């Protein structure tokens, strides 16, 4: 009976993506979450890191306009699905 709470706790934790289908779903979620944050005109390209880090999905985004190309990084919390976009990198 004492093991029952432990079992419920394990069942409540998110599953770790380990199958090819789970990783593909993770990449699609990361891409969709990051693209939803782009509020700029222009052609958008995105490169999603296949696995991210332990806690975050990561993507690089580029927005190309007539004025040039802005590059940004997007991170998505794997547990909550919340995504954030950095300010554009400066050209040096």
PLM region spans:
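Mitochondrial intermembrane space
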Residues: 17-92
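Positively charged n-region of N-terminal signal peptides that target proteins for export
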Residues: 1-4
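N-terminal signal peptide c-region/cleavage motif recognized by signal peptidases
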Residues: 7, 12-14
